[in-house]
Each structure stands twice: as C-alpha cells, then as structure tokens.
C-alpha cells in the first residue's frame, strides 16, 4: 500500500483537532448555517448530482455504445471512480467545515488554486446552464396552446403554402431553430438579442435568486419540490410511454447488448466521463453542502445512497426516454410505410384499402412483374425501424426536437408538454443550486467583498453579473456559444481539479490522518476498498481518461454544427470548422481554471521565498543594531 505523504509544515495549526471539532460545532450553531434535517441535505445533493445530463446524455451514450453493453463499463467506473471521489468530497468538507476554497487552503496554502479553479468552473457552467432553463421556460409558456405551436408549419406570406424552411425540415425543427433561437449560420454572425429569450432568461435568473437568496436556508426548502417532482413526472411518462404503440421497440433497442463495444476504448472513455460529470464532482458545491452537516454525520452512507440514486436515475430516465423514442420511431415508420403505399396506389391506380402494410411487399412484387417500366419510375422511401431508433438524440436535440415531436402525436399533447418541461425546469434549477453555492461560498472565503455585506447582497450581485454576461446566449449565435462552453468549460478542467483533490487529500493531507478523521466522524475506519481506490485506482482512472481525451482532441480539428437552410443536404446540420479566434476562447475557458492551480502554487512559493528573505534581512538588521547599542550579552 502506498504511504507516501509530502512534507506539510504548519498543518496542525491550520486545521482544528478532532477534540476541538465538537466544540467548534456548538460555537458555530448560531453563526454558521446548518441543515434542518437529513432529508433536506440528501435531497439537495441528489438534486445537484442528478441533472439534465441524466435525462438526455446517458440515453444517447447507451444507444451509441451497444445498448445494455454500455451499462457494464458505466457501473464498473461508477463504483471505482464516482463513489470514492464523492465520499472523499463529503468527508473532507464535513471534517474541515469549510467551503471549497477554505478546505484546500487549510490543507496547504499553495492548494488554494484548487478552490479557485472550482469556482471558475462553477461560474462558467452556471453561465450557460441557466440559459437552458430559459429555453425550457419558453417552451413551457408555449405549451398552454391547442394545438402546440410546433405541431404545424406556419403559412408563408401569400398564405399559399408552408414557409419554405419549415417545409424542407419539420415543424419541430423550425420552431426550435427559427421561432425560438432565430439561429444564424455562423458563430461569427452574432446578430441581435432575441427579446423573448432575454425575457425568459430574466425570469430564470430571478427564480434562481429567490431560491438561493439565503443559501441553504432557502434552497433547503426548494429542494422538496425540485428534487422530487422529476421522479413523479418520469414515472408518469413511463406509465404513459408503455401504453403507446412501439414503446417496447425503443426499450428493447436500448438494452439489447452489443458485447463487441466493450473492446472499444471510446466506450470506456465515455462511460468514465459520464460517471464523472453526472456526479457533479469538483464543482465545490458538494464540499460546501457537506460542511453544514453534524460532525458525526455518516458521510460514507451518504455517498453510497447518493451514488445509487444517481445511477438508478440514469437507467430509469433512459428507459422512459426510449419508450417515447420507440413510439416516435414507430409513428415515423408507419408514416413511411403509408407514404410508400400511397405512392404504389397512385402509380398503378389501385383501389384504396386493397394495399396494407401486411401485403405491401406482395403488391410491390406483383406491380414490378406486371409493368417493370412504370414501377421503376416510382420513388419509394427506405423504411427501417432500427434506423429511426438509432438517430442521434443527444442534448438539446432530444429535449426540444425529438421529445416535442413525440408529444405532438400524443392525445392531450399540451398536458404532456407542460409536465415534460416542468420536469426539465426542476432538474436544471436544482443543479443550479449547487453551481451557485460553488461560486458564492468561495467568494466569501476570498474576502473580496466587505464582511459586513449581507449574503443576500453578494448573491444578488453574482446573479446580476452572470445574467448580464449571459446576454451572449440570447443572440442569434447564442446556441453556438452555449455548445462551445458546454464542450470545454465542464470537461477537462473538472477532471484535473478532481485529480488534484484526490492527490491533495491522499498525499498532502495524508490518507492515514484522513482515515482517523473518518473514524472519529462515523465510528469506523474506511475499509480496504476505499483505501485502494483513493490511493491508486481512482487517480489512475482519471489519468487514463485525461490522456485518452487529450490524444483524441489534439488530433481533431474543432468542428461545430450549424443550421443553414441553403445547405445542399438541408435539413441535415452542416459541420464546419470553428474560426481561428475560437481557439483563444477555448484556451481561456478550459485553460484559466486548469492553470489557476499551478499558478497559485508558484505564486505562494515565490511569496514565501521573498518573505523568508525579508525576515532574514530584518533579523540581521536587528542583531546589528543591538550589537552597536551593547544590548547583546554573552
């Protein structure tokens, strides 16, 4: 077992002893916030961990990597990567009773950069995450109509047909790209602010501010709704989905394993990344939340419970999503077959009703044998249920295109639309609670603002500043900017932060000391599983993921998808390379958090060297003066 611990002078003075912990907890009772009850804490952590990615990214990864086969690497890495790091964050926050900034600076002043990096990432992710909530609110407000506004294409100015862009694509595509985003054809073409998105963005930030105005005192109340309602809605959708035609096609397609995918490195890479991101690790929010617990709270049990709920939610949400996707694919398959039947009937002037989906192939063969030349001129569509099921359905495309299309085909579609977007709103809002906690608490720890400022004022200023910067997402190019930040702000930086967190606890704070802390808090030392994963397995997994990601990304040209009605293959999205100036944005978004860790450590080292030099110089001067005055005695 590795027992290396780096020198860490002054640690005993920076952290309270175990004997002092209970005394400090009693002294903080009136000044430091605490959870009203255990359920409130657990719901907040679950709400932060379980977010939009569980609903729209995990199902896509299952479908892309062999269906049920993806569950194998996902569950393995959940156990060896996700749970150990979650336990570590819970335990260190509860032990040191500080936010992410205070925890790492207490372990060693040079590690304060880890807290700064977490704060930067929380800020940037929160910046665009609340814009998604604004889009959800826009769809929610438009759901109180019959028929739904995205169920039909609008007429052109002459009222003689549909708008050309909508006719070429679909009503759901048109409502998303044109009516909602009014998207441009390039990230360089910023355009103007879309007032309806700005209005929804204002509402989203206002609701968030009201919920987090007093930290856990207010978020602790909101999570009773935001963390539980999504499960109610998911269950309602599952019951409804299972009654729809073709739902089982989607579920069977999702969980049918393709074992050969297990030999694909990308499958393991994506599984590791999904486990990592779905736990909301390294944002700093979980450390802050756990610091409000009682000293003797069982953080080990908490980490296991939250992890099980998180993994279960991912699988449960995937089942719900693919029951709906199965229904949508079956509807499209039936429409495709009916179109081909109509083509055959019109081409050979057959009586209506004679040709059905059951005898269609037989009629095709008869028509081809009867009049091969006329049959050859007919254009039939390719109808394959698996091709409809396997269409990429990741991210916003799943929520705002695929699901909205499926909802339009359901009876009482406005009701299902309202329920769906309420669920997304709750998932997004509860995740934002943790993101903002990861910004507000570190800023308080940095003492940038006067201590006499109330938390309500600091929280309000942060929300206002972030809201103003988020105006960029209300432009015509806003979707492209959001995708850019989503790809780089919460990927590599989080991986590096998490690796540094584990290294700091195991090799700077000392894993033996950490074990004694946990024994004091929960009554027993962590078992051999935690020892091995903390010291070796989890850091190694993160290192491998980072190296694979680095090798893959370095060799790739940065591309993004645009919506261009003039594209030859429209309505397919066109892939084009990013302009050169975007690379500077990527370096800033991903580089600033990563570089803040070594840069702050170097700054601390140089500062300490300068202080030692000054102290030595001051001592020499003092001794010289004393000697001259005859004050020194042998």
Curated annotation (Swiss-Prot):
Localization per record: Cell membrane
Coiled coil: none
Tissue expression as described in the entry: Predominantly expressed in kidney and small intestine (at protein level). Expressed in the intestinal brush border (at protein level). Expression not observed in other organs, such as lung, skeletal muscle, brain, liver and pancreas. In kidney, expression is localized in the renal cortex but not in the medulla. Substantial amounts of expression in the proximal tubules. The distal nephron segments and the glomeruli are consistently negative. In the small intestine, expression is exclusively localized in villus enterocytes.
Catalytically driven reaction(s): L-alanine(in) + Na(+)(in) = L-alanine(out) + Na(+)(out); L-cysteine(in) + Na(+)(in) = L-cysteine(out) + Na(+)(out); L-glutamine(in) + Na(+)(in) = L-glutamine(out) + Na(+)(out); glycine(in) + Na(+)(in) = glycine(out) + Na(+)(out)
Pfam families: SNF
Keywords: Amino-acid transport, Cell membrane, Glycoprotein, Membrane, Phosphoprotein, Symport, Transmembrane, Transmembrane helix, Transport
Topological domains, Extracellular: 63-67, 141-192, 243-268, 326-413, 478-487, 553-581
Modification sites for Phosphoserine: 17, 627
Any one GO BP annotation for this protein: neutral amino acid transport
Effect of inactivating the gene: Deficient mice exhibit reduced growth, impaired body weight control, insulin response and amino acid absorption and excretion.
TM region positions: 42-62, 68-88, 120-140, 193-213, 222-242, 269-289, 305-325, 414-434, 457-477, 488-508, 532-552, 582-602
PANTHER family, sorted: SODIUM-DEPENDENT NEUTRAL AMINO ACID TRANSPORTER B(0)AT1, SODIUM/CHLORIDE DEPENDENT TRANSPORTER
Assembly behavior: Interacts in a tissue-specific manner with ACE2 in small intestine and with CLTRN in the kidney. Interacts with CLTRN; this interaction is required for trafficking of SLC6A19 to the plasma membrane and for its catalytic activation in kidneys. Interacts with ACE2; this interaction is required for trafficking of SLC6A19 to the plasma membrane and for its catalytic activation in intestine. Interacts with ANPEP; the interaction positively regulates its amino acid transporter activity.
Function, in words: Transporter that mediates resorption of neutral amino acids across the apical membrane of renal and intestinal epithelial cells. This uptake is sodium-dependent and chloride-independent. Requires CLTRN in kidney or ACE2 in intestine for cell surface expression and amino acid transporter activity.
Record-given protein name: Sodium-dependent neutral amino acid transporter B(0)AT1
Source organism of the structure: Mus musculus (Mouse)
Gene name of the record: Slc6a19
């Amino acid at each position: 077992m590795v027992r290396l611990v780096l020198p860490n002078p002054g640690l005993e003075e920076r952290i309270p002893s175990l004997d002092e912990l209970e005394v400090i907890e009693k002294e903080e009772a009136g000044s430091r916030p605490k959870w009203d009850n255990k359920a409130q804490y657990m719901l907040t952590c679950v709400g932060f961990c379980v977010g939009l990615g569980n609903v729209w990214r995990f199902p896509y990864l299952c479908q892309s990597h062999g269906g049920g086969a993806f569950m194998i690497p996902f569950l393995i890495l959940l156990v060896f990567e996700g749970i150990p790091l979650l336990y570590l964050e819970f335990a260190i926050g509860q032990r040191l009773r500080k936010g992410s900034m205070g925890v790492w600076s207490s372990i060693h002043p040079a590690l304060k950069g880890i807290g700064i990096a977490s704060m930067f990432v929380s800020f940037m992710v929160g910046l665009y995450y609340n814009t998604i909530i604004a889009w959800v609110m826009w769809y929610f407000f438009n759901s109180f109509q019959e028929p739904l506004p995205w169920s039909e294409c609008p007429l052109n100015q002459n009222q003689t047909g549909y708008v050309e862009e909508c006719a070429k694509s679909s009503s759901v595509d048109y409502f998303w790209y044109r009516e909602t985003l009014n998207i441009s054809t390039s990230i360089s073409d910023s355009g103007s602010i879309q007032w309806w998105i700005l209005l929804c963005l204002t509402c989203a930030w206002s609701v968030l501010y009201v919920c987090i105005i007093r930290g856990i005192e207010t978020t602790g109340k909101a999570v009773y709704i935001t963390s539980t309602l999504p499960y109610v809605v998911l269950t309602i959708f599952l019951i409804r989905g299972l009654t729809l035609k073709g739902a089982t096609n989607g579920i069977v397609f999702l969980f049918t394993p393709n074992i050969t995918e297990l030999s694909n490195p990308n499958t393991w890479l994506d599984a590791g990344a999904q486990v990592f991101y779905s736990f909301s690790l390294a944002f700093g929010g979980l450390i802050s939340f756990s610091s409000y617990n009682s000293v003797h709270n069982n953080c080990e049990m908490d980490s296991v419970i939250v992890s099980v709920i998180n993994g279960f939610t991912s699988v449960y949400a995937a089942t719900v999503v693919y029951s709906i996707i199965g229904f949508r694919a079956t509807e499209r398959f039936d429409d495709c077959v009916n179109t081909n039947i109509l083509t055959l009937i019109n081409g050979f002037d057959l009586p209506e009703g004679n040709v059905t989906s059951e005898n269609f192939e037989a009629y095709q063969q008869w028509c081809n044998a009867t009049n091969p030349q006329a049959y050859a001129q007919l254009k039939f569509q390719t109808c394959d249920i698996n091709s409809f099921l396997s269409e990429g359905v990741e991210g916003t495309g799943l929520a705002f295109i695929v699901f909205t299309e499926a909802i339009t085909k359901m009876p009482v579609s406005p009701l299902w639309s309202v329920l769906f977007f309420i669920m997304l709103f709750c998932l997004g809002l509860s995740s934002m609670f943790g993101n903002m906690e990861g910004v507000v608490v570190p800023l308080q720890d940095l003492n940038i603002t006067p201590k006499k400022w109330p938390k309500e004022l600091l929280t309000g200023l942060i929300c206002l500043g972030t809201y103003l910067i988020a105006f960029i997402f209300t432009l015509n190019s806003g979707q492209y900017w959001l995708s850019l930040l989503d790809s780089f702000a919460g990927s590599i930086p989080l991986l590096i932060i998490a690796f540094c967190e584990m290294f700091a606890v195991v090799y700077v704070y000392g894993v033996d000391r950490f074990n004694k802390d946990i024994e004091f808090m929960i009554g027993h030392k962590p078992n051999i599983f935690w020892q091995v994963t903390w010291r070796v397995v989890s850091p190694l997994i993160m290192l491998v993921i980072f190296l694979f990601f680095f090798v893959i990304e370095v060799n790739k040209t940065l591309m993004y998808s645009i919506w261009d009605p003039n594209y030859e293959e429209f309505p397919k999205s066109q892939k084009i390379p990013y302009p050169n100036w975007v690379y500077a944005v990527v370096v800033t978004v991903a580089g600033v958090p990563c570089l803040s860790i070594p840069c702050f450590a170097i700054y601390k080292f140089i500062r300490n060297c300068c202080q030692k030099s000054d102290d030595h110089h001051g001592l020499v001067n003092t001794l010289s003066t004393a000697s001259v005055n005859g004050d020194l005695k042998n």
